Design a protein with these regions (language model features):
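Accessory carbohydrate-binding/adhesion or oligomerization-edge regions at the termini
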Residues: 1-78, 177, 181-183, 306
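Accessory beta-strand-rich segments of carbohydrate-active enzymes
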Residues: 2-9, 16-17, 33-34, 48-54, ...
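Active-site-adjacent substrate/metal-binding segments within catalytic domains
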Residues: 75-96, 123-128, 134-137, 146, ...
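Structural motif
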Residues: 140, 294, 362, 390-391
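Conserved, mostly hydrophobic/aromatic
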Residues: 142, 211, 356, 392, ...
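Surface beta-strand/loop "capping" patches
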Residues: 218-244
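Extended acidic/polar, glycine-enriched regions
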Residues: 244-258, 286-380
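Substrate-binding/catalytic cleft of secreted carbohydrate-active enzymes
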Residues: 433-639
């Protein structure tokens, strides 16, 4: 665990040292809702930046910044901390180059340069931001198009009308203004600190995930909610559009059933029926009829990842099947149920991460996605001990605490291959789980966990005012020795005196679940960590359960357990390992070890933070082997 206290030393990854500024994180940013490659423009790269004391756009900018790296990151080229009393500005001119624009626009216009005023009324431009920390406003040609608060969540906005009314024939100006209070406010901040030391690290700010411009039809698919049921082998799916045209009742029919002898058309009520399925054609319109094509499952672990950064898209899972054997019709903006019994039934596991790819057509729109059949549950074994189960079989989850910090990019990986390397390396070392620690990654990280077979425990990002270390660290550690907790009603002790801050945390928790819930690799939601900003734990646990009952919940990782959720979550860095009273929940040791070894040329400061310094790798291995032996002895008793 490294302590980073500023910009004294620069430490680069192999990928960061060789980064191509013209091809930065160029992979498709949203694998769970993928349109054709010619439907979007990646806006990563060189932007102008400026720091100001005023909230007014600067007349002059300070220089160039490499987006999406935060100005505090070495790879940004800036190496400057945004302070709470400052504003950070980004700006670039987006040029309508014939080589940049989607092919459909090229064909429609057939002119050069592109004339924004002749853009078809049946098309929309959507600008996407993967994440901007913490609060931002977005401007197109000086006109504000949206604001967003929440430094870890994606957002987008339709800029079509602004472009039509203000853009020139060849370009438009895109400006982003950022305000980041870091750890001086109640907003979500993770482990960021303006005074990094110990377990808290360098604060970063601004744009830190991909920015991209997408071209979509007038009526388009905004999101897909996929809820596969492992036990019933049924896929519940909802295709959410930007249209207000919704229906409550729907039955579907497959292509195979259409051709079957018992499939017939009743002309009187324009109804097609076949077997158990019926589709009411009089309820369908050109704007709400969807076509879902599902492929048989396959494993995509061996997608090549040794290409150059510019070519390494890792999206080949959508190209393996030339056609989908099963097709279903339905209506958008309402849940439909699709039995999967006519497909090959393959369960997702870390060893066999089968994925079902599928496509959805809605009018002129076409997207691709995937799902998996798996279920995570807590079930009792023959000795009446609660166990974490995958597909109703106990699975011992051996994981690492993945904090998602990069020495050269901070929150932002230098490239997609770096994410893959991390996941594959952990698997090669015998780990089958990563606990994503109080950070939300870009969507491609979860996609790689899905296809590579890595289980994820997802933390909610902590927030609240300044924490009281004597309470949430020192006293809590001592109390854990005796399995003592306390009520979370004391908002002043838990840094939760702000009512707005409490509401914001609940809102962002629900948004996190909404954003990530389609990823099959995610097994658990971790609501609070070590009492940081903890409040109303059992109430929030119920809200999380209502939002997603397909995963188990660790409501309080470490200490201040309120007796709810599915996990008795233990942190133990200092004491002999043991289990306490018998639980109806599963026991999990969710943090331990923390041993450190300084490796020459692999540290950014002269200090190292951890829970036991090791002189060499031999001592480090010896300590971990001793700890693992203790852990193994507790597995039969419930760990």
């Amino acid at each position: 665990m490294k302590q980073n206290s500023g910009f004294e030393k620069k430490l680069y990854t192999t990928w960061g040292r060789n980064i191509d500024k013209n091809n930065v994180l160029t992979e498709y940013p949203r694998p769970l809702l993928k349109r054709n490659a010619d439907s979007y423009v990646n806006l990563n790269g060189i932007w102008k930046y400026a720091f100001t004391a005023s909230n007014k756009r600067p007349v002059r900018f300070d220089g160039d910044i490499l987006v999406p790296f935060s100005p505090e990151a070495h790879l940004s080229g800036v190496n400057r901390q945004l302070k709470p009393n400052e504003y950070l500005w980004y700006e670039r001119i987006v040029t309508f180059d014939i080589n940049m624009l989607p092919r459909e626009i090229h064909l429609f216009q057939n002119i050069y340069p592109f004339d924004i005023n002749r853009l078809s009324d049946n098309s929309r431009f959507i600008i996407h931001f993967g994440a901007v920390d913490q609060i931002c406003s977005v401007y197109v040609n000086g006109i504000k198009v949206c604001s967003h608060s929440g430094g870890y969540l994606p957002f987008d906005t339709d800029i079509t009308d602004i472009l039509k009314s203000t853009a020139t024939k060849t370009s438009f100006r895109l400006t982003v203004r950022v305000k980041d209070f870091s750890d001086t406010s109640y907003h979500a901040r993770g482990k960021q600190s303006l005074n990094p030391k110990g377990m808290f690290y360098t604060a970063q700010s601004g744009i830190w995930q991909t920015v991209w411009l997408e071209y979509v039809p007038e009526i388009y698919i905004k999101k897909i909610i996929a809820k596969p049921d492992f036990d019933t082998k049924v896929l519940r799916i909802k295709v959410v559009t930007n249209s207000d045209n919704t229906e409550n009742n729907f039955y579907y029919i497959s292509e195979a059933e259409k051709k079957h002898d018992n499939c017939q058309i009743n002309k009187n009520d324009t109804k097609i029926s076949g077997g158990k399925s019926t589709i009411h054609r009089n309820r369908l319109t050109k704007t709400n009829e969807i076509k879902v094509c599902i492929n048989n499952p396959d494993i995509y672990i061996d997608i090549p990842d040794d290409k150059t950064q510019a070519d390494s898209t890792h999206d080949e899972l959508y190209k393996d099947s030339p056609y989908a054997p099963f097709t279903y019709y339905g209506i958008s903006d309402t849940f439909i149920e699709i039995p999967l019994d006519k497909l090959d039934i393959k369960a997702w596991t870390p060893d066999t991460p089968y994925l079902y790819t599928f496509s959805v057509n809605l009018g002129k729109d076409y997207v691709q996605s995937y799902f998996a059949l798996r279920t995570f549950t807590i079930e009792k074994d023959a000795n009446d001990i609660p166990r974490i189960c995958l597909n109703h079989r106990p699975i011992f989850q051996k994981g690492v605490l993945d904090q998602g910090y990069w020495p050269d990019g901070l929150y932002t990986p230098p490239c997609d291959n770096a994410l893959i390397y991390d996941i594959k390396t952990m698997k090669s070392l015998g780990f089958n789980m990563l606990r994503k620690h109080i950070k939300i990654e870009n969507d491609r990280w979860y996609y790689h966990c899905d296809r590579l077979g890595m289980i994820v425990w997802q933390d909610m990002v902590n927030s609240g005012s300044r924490y009281k270390s004597w309470f949430v660290t020192y006293l809590a550690t001592f109390m854990s020795l005796f399995d003592i907790s306390c009520s979370d009603n004391f908002n002043h002790l838990f840094a939760r005196t702000s009512k707005k801050g409490r509401k914001e945390f609940i809102k962002e928790t629900m948004q996190t679940i909404d954003t990530l819930s389609n990823h099959p690799s995610i097994a658990a939601w971790v609501i609070f960590n070590e009492g940081w900003g903890q409040f109303e734990t059992n109430k929030i646990t119920k809200l999380v359960r209502k939002a997603d009952n397909s995963r188990f919940i660790d409501q309080a990782s470490g200490w201040f357990d309120q007796g709810g959720g599915d996990i008795k979550s233990i942190h133990n860095y200092f004491f002999p390992l043991r289990l306490f009273k018998k639980e109806n929940r599963a026991y999990a040791l969710t943090e331990y070890g923390g041993y450190t070894q300084i490796i020459k040329h692999h540290n950014t400061t002269n200090k190292c933070y951890g829970y036991g310094d090791c002189k060499n790798s031999k001592e480090l291995k010896r300590r971990y082997k001793k700890r693992e032996k203790e852990i193994s002895s507790l597995i039969p008793h419930g760990l």
